[in-house]
Amino acid sequence: MIELKNVSKVFTTKKVNVEALKSTSLQVKKGEVFGIIGYSGAGKSTLIRCVNLLEKPTTGNIIVNNQDLTTLSAKELAKARQKIGMIFQGFNLLKTVTVYENIALPLRLAGIPKTEIEKRVEKYLRIVDLFNRKDAYPSELSGGQKQRVAIARALSHEPEVLLSDEATSALDPETTDSILDLLLKINEEIGITILLITHEMNVIQRICDRVAVMEHGAVIESGTVKEIFTNPQHVTTKKFVNSAFAAKIPAEVQKELQRTGEIVTLSFIGNSSGEPALAIATKRFQVYPNILSGNITQLKHEAYGKLVIHMQGEQNEINHALSFLQEQGIIVEGGRTDYGKQVLFG
């Protein structure tokens, strides 16, 4: 559906060349929600703007819907872009026309017949639950409603791909959740492929199937959301994963606790998140866990929980208890023995 082959982008100024995107290859499957996450300056905005050639790559190939966009003429590219919708952080609505006209006007410019325009505007305004505001002006809408209009406008061209450039960054948490729910609904009901960029891990965990982590213009790690959450490899990826969980244990507290036991992180995925494995381990072995912090969150299709505990007891009993927890499908990290990679607490 979307494939980037060795794509790079260099911005040239009078004094210096800035390599915003290093040789990057990426594949997004048809019908999936693929997220790209990174801090400011990571290159994610440059990458997504290269996908529809809003930014022309310096090198490499951009293949969307089996077409290499870098080889198309201006006329062919304009036609190909009609199948690539895009939404932005800033909404980009026309302030002087109504909600209806914000969607209808681009369709008129594309030569769509009047009856078809009327049908599409109503259809997609109903999908985003804003048909009753079709005669309102953007100034009369909330931020979330403006983004819903932008989504309806992008969908009205009936694209096969939807690009989302930090579409929820300007919204409050509650509105962000409603927009993410809408994007998930669109993906599941229409089957549209979504490629989004964000700096917020909650966006990734809520709706994405797979994710790529970017830093300094390059993809440093990628995989399914489940893989990234349960087994992050790069230090930056670990920071993003830990940002989804509020608690941090100060270094001095860690040092003090490690004198009397082990600090261990238990990660639960899917069905294991509801099993009383820790309680069973406590009864079966002579160990005494003290819960330091814990959280459970929802990935796209399954629960994921993380529990940080201070476990006391004889070392042999602790080892048996942690082995038992692993046998129950729980990921064990930290401690003095080799149960997994040490997690980052702060």
From Swiss-Prot:
Belongs to the ABC transporter superfamily. Methionine importer (TC 3.A.1.24) family. This is Methionine import ATP-binding protein MetN 1. The complex is composed of two ATP-binding proteins (MetN), two transmembrane proteins (MetI) and a solute-binding protein (MetQ). It comes from Bacillus cereus (strain ATCC 14579 / DSM 31 / CCUG 7414 / JCM 2152 / NBRC 15305 / NCIMB 9373 / NCTC 2599 / NRRL B-3711). Residues 2-241 form the ABC transporter domain. Its main location: membrane. SUPFAM superfamilies: ACT-like (SSF55021), P-loop containing nucleoside triphosphate hydrolases (SSF52540). GO terms for cellular component: plasma membrane. Signal peptide: none annotated. It is a peripheral membrane protein. Keywords: Amino-acid transport, ATP-binding, Cell membrane, Membrane, Nucleotide-binding, Translocase, Transport. ATP binds at G38, Y39, S40, G41, A42, G43, K44, S45. One of its GO terms (molecular function) is ATP binding. The lineage of its organism: Bacteria, Bacillati, Bacillota, Bacilli, Bacillales. Part of the ABC transporter complex MetNIQ involved in methionine import. Responsible for energy coupling to the transport system. It catalyses: L-methionine(out) + ATP + H2O = L-methionine(in) + ADP + phosphate + H(+); D-methionine(out) + ATP + H2O = D-methionine(in) + ADP + phosphate + H(+). Its EC number is 7.4.2.11. It is found in: Cell membrane. The gene is metN1.
